[in-house]
Structures are given as structure tokens and as C-alpha cells.
A protein has these predicted regions:
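Non-catalytic cap/lid and distal C-terminal segments of serine-dependent acyl enzymes
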Residues: 1-451
Length: 451
């Protein structure tokens, strides 16, 4: 269940088998003869079928992605071409199956699922959405928070640094833990799925410091476990902790939507009090149950796609709770259909209530100079880049410190998220006293700095 889908034996095996079978099939087609004089050679027939199928696939994928915007964002040309290539491959092998007989036909039939599987793995490698076989079926290997003992904060981060210099740190594991937990919906009554949390080594000691918090939100469709896995959270945080005496932020990944196909708009609406859940229930629970710092400067919210939108609408509305924003590939406004439809279905016709949730409006109304925005977008996601620039301008007008990053070679995908959050973690760590940044943002290899 934990075998990787984006690297290693699974994709290599599938791609390898597909390539070998395809080569054998092409040789078989080349050696075949037309049954009747005047008919096209079977290989030519298959090639024509591939071209026609690929062209049709390219057109349909482009229409779905960029014209009708079925998924709300463009799929990006690498994905569109991968899908078109896969459909071309299917067209080729189906035509081969029709023209061939015996073992060669059987090979062509077997190639159909192999080509489809290779195409799916190719698309997944571009997005980085499903990291393991287990993520396809919602499997998570993580234990419950109730399976371990977590102690209350016994010192500040500064005290921890002092003990580290003296060589008198309390015992702790070499790596942190990812755990699941049901966070009570005491104030919101919002129906949420299990949350995920990452506790760094320092948080697992018997005398932990009061640590900063990153409250991170997945996209929609998505889930807390998807963010943990696709965001490579554990490995990123463990690598940071290894360089900082076991210190890293505690990561909270609550569920902002209730289910994969639902969009809560991260607001208190007729369809659930998501804002109260995220900013009251989750925060109060963490401050009561985990060794976390209390001040707003020590709290950040971040997210991908819809989770990034939630970040830019919620953080400025709650400056008493959050001091930093780390959105990636976010939207200009909460989106689930037209504005008129959302106003009616979510806000009972109250347009003002919806407008208050639009990030630039929220930033202008209640954003403060004490807050800071660290944001990024994939190079191929032009819409998200435009959104980022607009929101960044609003943040500057509110007096916020603003950093904008572009991730070359990525689009609306988890590769962009990982690339932005790596320097984002160092930035937030310096901001909260965990450790100083050892290089400038321009020295990080996977990002380009706009501001």
C-alpha cells in the first residue's frame, strides 16, 4: 500500500512492460501482410488510427481543460499532451487488435489496459497528487494521536535553544510523527473528517517547548491525508528538525470541506460553519491539547488551490490568531459555480456576506502590517500567477511583508506546493525563532523570486 506511484518500481515496471509490449506489437504489425491486395498495410492502419485518436483526444482534453474549465483550472499542456498521447496509444492498439490474429491480437488487447495505466501514471507524475498505492483508496498508515502521550509545553523556543547550546536537551526521537485525530466541533457543529497532525521530535519529548503552528489545508477535491502525502510534509519537516535540534512547526491539517466532493467555501454558511471550525474549534483544541505557542506571530495558515483561497480569506479576517499566510496556486475568491449561485445557496441571498469572504476585501478590511504573506504559483498556471499578483498587491497596501515565488516547470500541482513550502518553512522558522535562514530566497534552486 505504501509503494510509490511517482517513482521507483511501480511506474518503472508499468512503463517498461508497456514499452516492451508496444515494441513487440509494432514488429508484429510490420511483419504482417494485408489480407487483400490494395488494402493498407496493418501498421499504416494502426498509425492512422493513432493520429486520429490522438487528435481527437487532444481536442477533447483542451476543451475540457481550457474552454469549459470543468475542473475550475487549466490542466496544463503537459497533462493535455499526456492524455492525448495515451488516447493515441489506445487507438493504435485497438486498430492492431482488429487487423491482427492469434497471439498478436492477444498482445494488442493486453496493451490497452497497460497504455491506460501508463497514461494515468504519467498524469499523476505531473500532478504529484497520488503518491502511493494506498492513497488511491484512502489508506493511511498513520496511528491515532491517542496512541501516544503528548506533554504540555514546559519552556519557550528560546529556552530550548539555550539547552541545546549547553547539551542538556530532554530526550526525544530522531524523527517526528504523523498522526490522525478527530478534532471536536464544539462551537461550529461542522461535520469534518479526521484531521492529520505532524509533531516534530521536540514536541514528542517529555518537556517540549511551545512550538509555532502551520495550519495547512488541502485543495478540493482533496483530504487531510492527501496534503500530508502529496505535500511531502513529514520528510520536509523531519529534514528541518534534523538541522534545528529537533525543532520544527507543529503541522495541523484539518478538513475544511467535510467530504472530497463538497466545497464549504471555508465560510460560515447555510451548508456548515467551516470558518468557525477552522479558526475556533481547531485552534482552541490545539492550544489545549498540544505544546503550541499562543501568539498570532507563531501561527500560520497555508494551503493549495482551494486551500490557498481559504488561507487568503481567513487569515486577514483573524489577525488575532494568525500572523502569516503561505498559499500556493490559490483563487481570487471562494468559488463553486457562479457568484449569484453561491450567494443564494451558501449565504441565503446575502451578497455582502459573500463579498466579505473575497480575499482582497478581507485584506483591505482587517489585514494588518503584523501579518506577512509568503505565496507562490506554478509557472504554467497563468491564472494562479495572476491571482497571486492581485492578492499580493492588496497585502502590500495593507502594510504586509510580501514574498512572491514562481516555480519553473510546474503548474497547478503538488510539485509547486513542495517547492514553495520548502523555503516557506525556513522563512516561517526564522520568523518564529526556530532558526535563521542560511541562504537567501534567490539561492533556492526550484523557485524564482518575484518580490
Amino acid at each position: 500500500m505504501e509503494l510509490s506511484l511517482v517513482r521507483g518500481i511501480v511506474p518503472r515496471t508499468v512503463f517498461g512492460l508497456t514499452a516492451i509490449a508496444a515494441i513487440i506489437l509494432i514488429i508484429g504489425l510490420a511483419l504482417s501482410k494485408s489480407k487483400k491486395r490494395g488494402r493498407l498495410h496493418p501498421l499504416i492502419v494502426s498509425l492512422i488510427a493513432a493520429v486520429l485518436a490522438g487528435a481527437a483526444g487532444l481536442l477533447v482534453a483542451w476543451l475540457v481543460s481550457d474552454v469549459f474549465m470543468v475542473f475550475g483550472v487549466s490542466l496544463g499542456w503537459p497533462v493535455i499532451f499526456t492524455i492525448a498521447g495515451g488516447i493515441a496509444g489506445v487507438g493504435f492498439v485497438i486498430a492492431a487488435a482488429v487487423t491482427l490474429r492469434g497471439v498478436r491480437r492477444a498482445l494488442a488487447v493486453v496493451l490497452v489496459p497497460l497504455v491506460l495505466l501508463s497514461t494515468a501514471l504519467g498524469v499523476d507524475s505531473i500532478y504529484g497528487e497520488y503518491q502511493t498505492i494506498g492513497t488511491l483508496v484512502g489508506y493511511t498508515p498513520y496511528a491515532s494521536l491517542g496512541s501516544i502521550e503528548v506533554h504540555k509545553a514546559a519552556m519557550s523556543v528560546s529556552d530550548w535553544h539555550s539547552k541545546a547550546r549547553k547539551g542538556s536537551l530532554p530526550s526525544m526521537p530522531s524523527q517526528g510523527k504523523v498522526l490522525t485525530v478527530d478534532i471536536p466541533n464544539t462551537e461550529s457543529n461542522f461535520t469534518a473528517r479526521k484531521a492529520m497532525i505532524y509533531l516534530p521530535p521536540a514536541a514528542l519529548s517529555d518537556r517540549p517547548p511551545a512550538l509555532p503552528v502551520m495550519e495547512l489545508l488541502a485543495g478540493q477535491p482533496g483530504s487531510p491525508s492527501r496534503l500530508i502525502d502529496a505535500g511531502n510534509i513529514a520528510a520536509t519537516m523531519n529534514a528541518y528538525a534534523a538541522k534545528h535540534d529537533g525543532l520544527a512547526p507543529i503541522v495541523l491539517v484539518p478538513d475544511q470541506n467535510g467530504e472530497a466532493t463538497h466545497n464549504s467555501l471555508c465560510a460560515d454558511t447555510t451548508q456548515g460553519n467551516a470558518e468557525t471550525y477552522l479558526t475556533t474549534d481547531v485552534v482552541n483544541w490545539a492550544k489545549k491539547m498540544l505544546p503550541v505557542a499562543k501568539s498570532a506571530r507563531m501561527w500560520a495558515m497555508g494551503g493549495f488551490s482551494q486551500g490557498g483561497t481559504c488561507t487568503t480569506q481567513l487569515v486577514p479576517r483573524h489577525p488575532d490568531i494568525y500572523g502569516a499566510l503561505l498559499p500556493v496556486d490559490g483563487e481570487l475568491k471562494p468559488t463553486n459555480g457562479s457568484v449569484a449561485k453561491m450567494v443564494q445557496e451558501y449565504f441565503a441571498g446575502d451578497r455582502k456576506a459573500y463579498d466579505e469572504q473575497v480575499p482582497v476585501n478581507a485584506i483591505a478590511a482587517t489585514g494588518t502590517p503584523e501579518q506577512a504573506l509568503f505565496t507562490g504559483a506554478g509557472e504554467r498556471d497563468k491564472e494562479s500567477i495572476s491571482n497571486m499578483r492581485t492578492i499580493a498587491d492588496a497585502a502590500r497596501k495593507a502594510g504586509m511583508e510580501v514574498t512572491e515565488l514562481i516555480v519553473p516547470g510546474t503548474g497547478h500541482d503538488w510539485h509547486a506546493v513542495q517547492a514553495v513550502w520548502r523555503p516557506g518553512l525556513d522563512w516561517f522558522g526564522e520568523r518564529t525563532g526556530l532558526g535563521e535562514m542560511t541562504k537567501s530566497l534567490k539561492e533556492y534552486p526550484q523557485v524564482e523570486v518575484l518580490q
